[in-house]
UniProtKB/Swiss-Prot annotation:
GO cellular component: cytoplasm
Keywords assigned by UniProt, alphabetized: ATP-binding, Cytoplasm, Kinase, Magnesium, Metal-binding, Nucleotide metabolism, Nucleotide-binding, Phosphoprotein, Transferase
Protein role: Major role in the synthesis of nucleoside triphosphates other than ATP. The ATP gamma phosphate is transferred to the NDP beta phosphate via a ping-pong mechanism, using a phosphorylated active-site intermediate.
Chain positions recorded as ATP binding sites: K11, F59, R87, T93, R104, N114
Protein name: Nucleoside diphosphate kinase
Enzymatic reactions: a 2'-deoxyribonucleoside 5'-diphosphate + ATP = a 2'-deoxyribonucleoside 5'-triphosphate + ADP; a ribonucleoside 5'-diphosphate + ATP = a ribonucleoside 5'-triphosphate + ADP
Superkingdom, taxonomy of origin: Bacteria
Length: 141
């Protein structure tokens, strides 16, 4: 397996619950390294741009409103098979369907307020990382 980078957002609901450290610890215990991180209040334009692929879908307005409802933590994670590993750690999008012990099963409230976002492919990871981080802000460790 190759070392990959993936993008993660700890969403407003999880930030409000003060579980940033608990979520990040799960990434690290699984072998992922945080190589970039920012606590950030997204603007409406940033949220709309980030989720542009969903702009024609009915939930887009609610998604944008949720993502700007409070601060988020944007992170770049690095490790062996990082994209798949992060998705496994997160669990199913709907926390009611997420396996016990996953981040969403433990911290998410609903399919909308589902605690975390993670890249679903190498192409998405590259796009999402560059959306929030300059190359000089990502530091190998």
């Amino acid at each position: 397996m190759a070392v990959q980078r993936t993008f993660s957002i700890i969403k407003p609901d999880a930030v409000a619950k003060n579980v940033i450290g608990e979520i990040t610890t799960r990434f690290e215990k699984a072998g992922l390294k945080v190589v970039a991180s920012k606590l950030k209040q997204l603007s409406k334009a940033e949220a709309e741009g980030f989720y542009a692929e969903h702009s024609a879908r009915g939930f887009f307005g609610d998604l944008v409103a949720f993502m700007i409802s409070g601060p988020v933590v944007v992170q770049v994670l690095e490790g062996e098979n990082a994209i798949a590993l992060n998705r496994e750690l997160m669990g199913a999008t709907n926390p009611k369907e997420a396996a016990a012990g996953t981040i969403r099963a433990d911290f998410a409230e609903s399919i909308d307020a589902n605690a975390v976002h993670g890249s679903d492919s190498e192409a998405a990871a590259a796009r999402e990382i560059s959306y929030f981080f300059a190359a000089t802000e990502v530091t190998a460790r």
